[in-house]
Curated annotation (Swiss-Prot):
One Gene Ontology biological process: sperm DNA condensation
Cellular component, GO annotation: axonemal microtubule doublet inner sheath; nucleus; sperm flagellum
Protein known as: Testis-specific serine/threonine-protein kinase 6
Pfam families (UniProt xref): Pkinase (PF00069)
Binding positions for ATP per the UniProt entry: I18, G19, E20, G21, S22, Y23, S24, K25, V26, K41
Keywords, alphabetical: ATP-binding, Cell projection, Cilium, Cytoplasm, Cytoskeleton, Developmental protein, Differentiation, Flagellum, Kinase, Magnesium, Metal-binding, Nucleotide-binding, Nucleus, Phosphoprotein, Serine/threonine-protein kinase, Spermatogenesis, Transferase, Ubl conjugation
Tissue specificity as recorded in UniProt: Expressed in the testis, localized to the heads of elongating spermatids.
Extent of the signal sequence: none
UniProt EC number: 2.7.11.1
PTM notes: Autophosphorylated.
């Protein structure tokens, strides 16, 4: 039986494709069982290289089966088909953080603090459970229709991590969100990589632009070492700027832990920027 026919028999009606990767695509669908809209990630293991099938995909599935957090995407079920396809049925989202930034120009201070607090809390949960994401970026942060609640998604580069000296060597994620040590090919602490990526996400949220020009990847670490600049005329609190500076420390050991980020004073502050 084909995968699409099986899904139909299980009460799913597939809709349009809303995302596509090298070996997978994400489709929106309606579900009789879950009485509403869901997202279904379709993974074609026949087209994927052995490294993906034997290493990265099992890690992703293990994480998705084990995590339970209000700000991490929830998976309803996994459907395996004999033709090599795997269907991952999960929560659907109205939009993502990148689309919200592009639509609004930037995220206002109080809303940015609310959303970033949720993101930081989810990353803290992962790290407390010895898990890392390694591909945190605005398009992997899903948003509710009112743009007040987040869900972190896409654990394709996720893995277990127990901290130093349990270092990673795989280049993961997008260059624009990658930390200096990852770009330089140095064995890295993946938790500190996640923290760097949090800094990039926060900068994008509050400014509407990337902190570093990534058109020349070879020169990117040099620009990262110089630190960030802010657009002229941008109103942003010093507490927020200070948090961004902490997250984007060139030296991994100088960056805070995810737990320290979640407790940062700006996230509890009453100022608007």
């Amino acid at each position: 039986m084909s995968g699409d026919k099986l899904l139909s028999e299980l009460g799913y009606k597939l809709g349009r494709t809303i995302g596509e990767g090298s070996y997978s695509k994400v489709k929106v669908a309606t579900s009789k069982k879950y009485k509403g809209t869901v997202a279904i990630k379709v993974v074609d293991r026949r087209r994927a290289p052995p490294d993906f099938v034997n290493k990265f995909l099992p890690r992703e599935l293990s994480i998705l089966r084990g995590v339970r957090h209000p700000h991490i995407v929830h998976v309803f079920e996994f459907i395996e088909v004999c033709n090599g396809k795997l269907y991952i049925v999960m929560e659907a989202a109205a939009t993502d953080l990148l689309q919200a930034v592009q639509r609004n120009g930037r995220i206002p201070g109080s809303q940015a603090r609310e959303l970033f607090s949720q993101i930081a809390g989810a990353v803290r949960y992962l790290h407390d459970h010895h898990l890392v994401h390694r591909d945190l970026k605005c398009e992997n942060v899903l948003l509710s229709p009112d743009e007040r609640r987040v869900k972190i998604t896409d654990f394709g580069f996720g893995r277990q991590a127990h901290g130093y000296p349990d270092l990673s060597t795989t280049y993961c994620g997008s260059a624009a969100y990658a930390s200096p040590e990852v770009l330089l090919g140095i064995p890295y602490d993946p938790k500190k990589y996640d923290v760097w990526s949090l800094g990039v996400v926060l900068y994008v949220m509050v400014t509407g632009c990337m902190p570093f020009d990534d058109s020349d990847i070879a020169g990117l670490p040099r620009r990262q070492k110089r630190g960030v600049l802010y657009p002229d005329g941008l109103e942003l609190s010093e507490r927020c700027k200070s948090l961004i500076a902490e997250l984007l420390q060139f030296s991994p050991s100088a960056r805070p832990s995810a737990g320290q980020v979640a407790r940062n004073g700006w996230l509890r502050a009453g100022d608007s920027g």
